[in-house]
Amino acid sequence: MVQSAPASEIAALILRGFDDYREQFREITDGARARFEQAQWQEAQRASAQRINLYEEKVAETVAGLRAGLADSELLDVERWPIIKSAYIAQIDLRLDDELAETWFNSIFCGLFSHDNISDGTMFVHTTRPSLRAHARAPYTRTYRPGGDLRQALEKIFDDYRFDVPYDDRERDLERIDALLHSNLPDWVCKDPDLAIELIGSVFYRNKGAYLVGRLFTPDEQWPLVFPLLHREDHGIQFDTVITDEAEVSIIFSFTRSYFMVDVPVPAELVAFLKRLLPGKHLAELYTSIGFYKQGKSEFYRALINHLATTDDRFVMAPGVRGMVMSVFTLPGFNTVFKIIKDRFNPSKSVDHATVIQKYQLVKNHDRVGRLADTQQFADFRFPVSKFEPECLAELLEVAPSTVVMEGDVVLIRHCWTERRMTPLNIYLENASEAQTREALNDYGLAIKQLAAANIFPGDMLLKNFGVTRHGRVVFYDYDEICYLTEVNFRYIPEPRFPEDEMSSEPWYSVGPNDVFPEEFPRFLFVDLNQRRLFAKLHGNLYDAKYWQGLQEQIREGKVIDVFPYRRQETPEQLLG
């Protein structure tokens, strides 16, 4: 029944929707431990996708409830929303997840109003919360003081983080982890009587792994510390290795990985702790990595508008070959690209706008195995014309006039995705040394194989559609032809019927819409003959249809790949199990 309500009541209804979302978010997250202990890997993948979709589902539910219960005259009167915002601030002030509650309020407002009404008076364009809580440590950590005896501290850690499944071989792992720590750290650190180990109390879960995350520190220095744990079915829990290198820990929290499942009592304080471990990571990345991708989006937007306000940076077209479906531009001083869908595609492309959007959503929900760049979707970005180089703006207006619109001295971008900027692989190889070329092409092949084992076929595997990250990893970022591997029909090219067949410009055999012939990959992927030969040595099995068919068979049997986001001390073949 439609009724009148004071601002405080509307604020309470919005907050009630947030509480419902947070409760279900925690419920999904809390199940991660049991899924890890019971080796329920497919259930873990489903839970990850369910949690990603939960936010939009609950926003839609809350907006529908507000519309059903309140008169449009008061709900949709934008002049009332500064008062509603003030009432909401009072209601979230004592919460431990107040910054997430602000972002929720923004989502509800945008579900009710067009983006023309966005202002800091009606919603939280700028946060009212402190950016980092000024606490010396996270609210729930465990601290161990080895006093020169690392082994004793490790034994206590093994005891404190026990699971309901026993360790596979506790003594073996203790000896190995102790040896690895002594190997990774200077000898004086291990013997320092003031050395301390601080670990976050909650375990981080993702895919088939669990992670203890924290730091080693002395009064003068600190090192990040991560213990990856595995559960080998029928073998129990094992400590796989120990990581103390900041670059390697950064990769574990990479934008190319799925989001962690971790109990987070105070999100801002956990993020502040992680920020101290990984100072090179932006707050947006850290919030996103622990599942709060909408908060990551808010932090990204605030960083973007601050960058534009405080620098002379101007948008330019991104370097690389122009896309057939997407147009890509960037800010030189801001490590992000902005991708918009063109109005008209190259005739060789069979996709439409709706299909492209579906492909990006597929990537959002799927296990990215460290080989797909995460994206954020934005609507109705508004930037001053003065922030665009004239050539960039002219090109965007030409290729996407329905998406990029001039409104006086403002450029309206109706829809775009943001993505981490990388060096296109084809450009990287132009200036690479022989060793760098070999390493990049090897990682390019590994990227294709790991995506395939995760049931992803990139479709267009040209070098220009892959990027190289600052850590040297090869990542796929062009999604308009991406599909599930099991949807593809991998075939061998039939033998020619007559000698003339091989000379014909047209195939002598029928080709279905999902048919792929791996034998054709070498000439399509590599113009450079040296690169073609090298790749054949490194990953020649990618040219064999039987390799792809074998992967499809294992995927259909429900097997889930092990893809480790770190270098393992032992290097067994990746297992499908």
Swiss-Prot record:
Active site feature: D374
Localization (cell): Cytoplasm
EC numbers: 2.7.11.5, 3.1.3.-
GO terms for cellular component: cytoplasm
Single Gene Ontology BP annotation: glyoxylate cycle
Binding-site positions, ATP: A318, P319, G320, V321, R322, G323, M324, K339
Reactions catalysed according to its record: L-seryl-[isocitrate dehydrogenase] + ATP = O-phospho-L-seryl-[isocitrate dehydrogenase] + ADP + H(+)
Molecular-function annotations in GO: [isocitrate dehydrogenase (NADP+)] kinase activity; AMP binding; ATP binding; phosphoprotein phosphatase activity; protein serine/threonine kinase activity
Keywords for this protein: ATP-binding, Cytoplasm, Glyoxylate bypass, Hydrolase, Kinase, Nucleotide-binding, Protein phosphatase, Serine/threonine-protein kinase, Transferase, Tricarboxylic acid cycle
One Pfam family matching this protein: AceK_regulatory
Family label: Belongs to the AceK family.
Record HAMAP family: AceK
Function: Bifunctional enzyme which can phosphorylate or dephosphorylate isocitrate dehydrogenase (IDH) on a specific serine residue. This is a regulatory mechanism which enables bacteria to bypass the Krebs cycle via the glyoxylate shunt in response to the source of carbon. When bacteria are grown on glucose, IDH is fully active and unphosphorylated, but when grown on acetate or ethanol, the activity of IDH declines drastically concomitant with its phosphorylation.
PANTHER family: ISOCITRATE DEHYDROGENASE KINASE_PHOSPHATASE, PTHR39559
NCBIfam families assigned to the protein according to its UniProt record, in alphabetical order: PRK02946.1
Protein name: Isocitrate dehydrogenase kinase/phosphatase
